[in-house]
A protein has these predicted regions:
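Membrane-interface transmembrane helices that cradle and orient dolichyl/undecaprenyl
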Residues: 2, 92-95, 134-150, 257, ...
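Transmembrane-helix motifs of polytopic, lipid-linked glycan transferases
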Residues: 10, 74-95, 110, 133, ...
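Short helix- or helix-capping micro-motifs
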Residues: 13, 101-109, 157, 161, ...
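Transmembrane-lumen/periplasm boundary regions of multi-pass, lipid-linked membrane glycan transferases
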Residues: 19, 159, 171-274, 280-295
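Specific aromatic-rich, kink-prone transmembrane helix
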Residues: 41, 84-86, 126-144, 149-157, ...
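Membrane-interface alpha helices of multi-pass inner-membrane proteins
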Residues: 104-105, 137, 149-165, 199-202, ...
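Short acidic/glycine- and proline-prone juxtamembrane loop motifs at membrane-interface regions
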Residues: 113-127
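Membrane-proximal, lumen/periplasm-facing interface regions of secretory-pathway glyco-
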Residues: 299, 324-382, 391-416, 431-479, ...
């Protein structure tokens, strides 16, 4: 029996979700995922690095599926499935048929960032979903939907903004779309678009209020990126090259054809009107290009606009259904499927390093065994707490549940607004990668510092991470305010702005189980 495009879309979504659920269950957590997992155990309206949505998602996922990698990633996996459907739905709303919708969904998941990364629990996951949801609602409004849908669009846009601040660029993008045609400009004369702004503002105000009572922690962390610095145009080439690869080179070619055609015809490419997704993406894309003139753009930052490029690729193929374009799309789908299968299988089965110098899986390898060795060293040395210099190491150790004593982050204490008093007045075991921690650092922080060995994490036949161990006693006064290494100046500036409220709990928790 030959499947129609509509049924094929649902089979695609189900198949991809099944694969991602398997991978989510067997691939160990990354450092950032383990970090956000700790957030989820102390729910707030904001955190040091990002708005709160990913913590809420992980809390719900671990409530439903347990404190496991699958629980941490459950909502991101389901979110990727919903985003695929929303992308297909938007293709239909913009003038395409069922086949166009299927092509858009295929192109979207063939993108390397989405195909292999669509299960990772980072703030990008909810931001991508709510950005796509906002466009899907606006697509319904544009095709005759009730004006009351503007309220839903405001809600989804607000949720995108408390997922990741880059979603703030959605507002000027939608405004550009509203200015683009006479019909859209007439919508601005009604109260509905402005009501959407109000709803989005109310949602975002929850995070604003949290920041106002916590020294504007997240704003200082994130918006510090926009400070002017030295002109380095070489980053622009790196940015464009990286995104060309991560979009999937063949899909990127088709997306470029679609975007170019849309620019020449006021957004229309074949039967599809791409003005909404392309104009909505434009301000963020311009910001990323400008940012790349002075600093590096991280590979995952543009992921929220990838659905727009998938729609452009599908439109390019549908506009010329004969010739080279369908063949390029077919090649892109094969490349995307192979890359997704290869990456997920290699990570899920903990495949071997590439060579003696390169092991991309090193950041997620061997944490349970390593934590067991740390705990054994703690017991052997009589330490009553374990200290680290990096949030990722602390988060990974906590996720294993194998450390039977309090874990203490010796710097950046502002990451943990609920942190209770740390027992640093008692003997402790301090460790971290050798490049992050030195004997001299600790001797400035503790009166007694004794090297007690070294632990290694990784595959012996390739590059490994080495962690020197130190037994410490007698902290200097104000150790945690200064940080170790010393961060006193940074903390004093922050505390002068607005002191962090007094501790209200114990974070990180002593026994924070869950496997990685």
């Amino acid at each position: 029996m030959r499947l129609d495009a509509g049924r094929s879309l649902w089979l695609l979504i189900l198949a991809l979700t099944a694969v991602r659920l398997w991978a989510a269950a067997v691939i160990p957590l990354t450092e950032d995922e383990a970090y956000y997992r700790l957030w989820s155990q102390h729910l707030h309206f904001g955190y040091y690095d990002h708005p709160p949505m990913i913590a809420w998602w992980i809390w719900l996922g671990t409530t439903l599926a347990g404190d496991t990698p699958l629980g941490v990633r459950l909502l991101p996996v389901l979110g990727a499935a919903v985003t695929t459907w929303l992308t297909a739905d938007l293709a239909r709303r913009l003038g395409g048929g069922a086949r166009t919708a299927l092509l858009a969904a295929l192109a979207y998941n063939a993108m390397l960032t989405i195909g292999a990364g669509g299960l990772i629990a980072t703030p990008d996951a909810p931001a991508i979903l709510f950005w796509a949801a906002t466009l899907a609602v606006l697509g319904r409004i544009a095709t005759g939907g009730s004006p009351r849908l503007w309220l839903l669009a405001g809600l989804t846009a607000g949720l995108a903004c408390i997922s990741k601040y880059s979603a703030l660029f959605l507002a000027p993008g939608v405004f550009l779309w509203l200015l683009s045609t006479a019909e859209n400009r007439r919508r601005l004369a009604t109260p509905w678009p402005w009501s959407a702004v109000g709803v989005a503002g109310l949602v975002f105000a929850t995070n604003l209020a949290w920041n106002a009572t916590h020294g504007w922690l997240t704003f200082e962390k994130q918006f510090g990126r926009v400070e002017p610095s030295q002109f380095r145009p070489g980053y622009l080439g790196e940015f464009l090259t990286t995104q060309f690869v991560l979009l999937n080179p063949l899909i990127a070619v088709l997306a470029g054809v679609g975007v170019w055609a849309g620019m020449r015809s006021r957004g229309r490419v074949g039967r599809l009107d791409l003005s909404l997704p392309l104009l909505a993406a434009l301000p963020f894309c311009l910001y990323l290009a400008i940012h790349s003139l002075h600093d590096r753009v991280q590979a995952h930052w543009p992921a929220t606009v990838f659905a727009a490029f998938a729609l452009a690729a599908a439109a390019a193929v549908e506009a010329r259904p004969r010739g080279w374009r369908p063949r390029v799309l077919g090649g892109g789908l094969i490349l995307g499927a192979a890359a997704m299968a290869g990456v997920l299988a290699w990570a899920g089965l903990q495949g071997p390093p590439i060579n003696s110098r390169t092991d991309p899986l090193l950041p997620i390898r061997g944490w349970p065994q390593f934590a067991g060795e740390v705990e054994a060293a703690r017991v052997r040395t009589g330490a009553e707490w374990v200290g680290v210099a990096h949030y990722g190491a602390l988060s990974q150790l906590a996720a294993t549940g194998r450390i039977e004593a309090p874990l203490v982050h010796l710097i950046e204490r502002e990451r943990w607004p609920d942190a209770g008093p740390a027992p640093v007045d008692k003997p402790g075991l301090v460790l971290d990668k050798s490049r992050r921690l030195s004997l001299a650092d600790l001797q400035a922080c503790f009166r007694s510092v004794t090297p007690v060995g070294e632990l290694v994490r990784g595959v012996p036949t390739s590059r490994v991470d080495r962690y020197p161990l130190f037994r410490v006693e007698g902290p200097v006064e104000g150790l945690l305010a200064r940080g170790c290494p010393d961060e006193l100046g940074k903390n004093r500036r922050r505390q002068a702005a607005a002191p962090i409220p007094p501790p209200r709990g114990a974070w990180p928790a002593q026994r924070t189980g869950g496997g990685s």
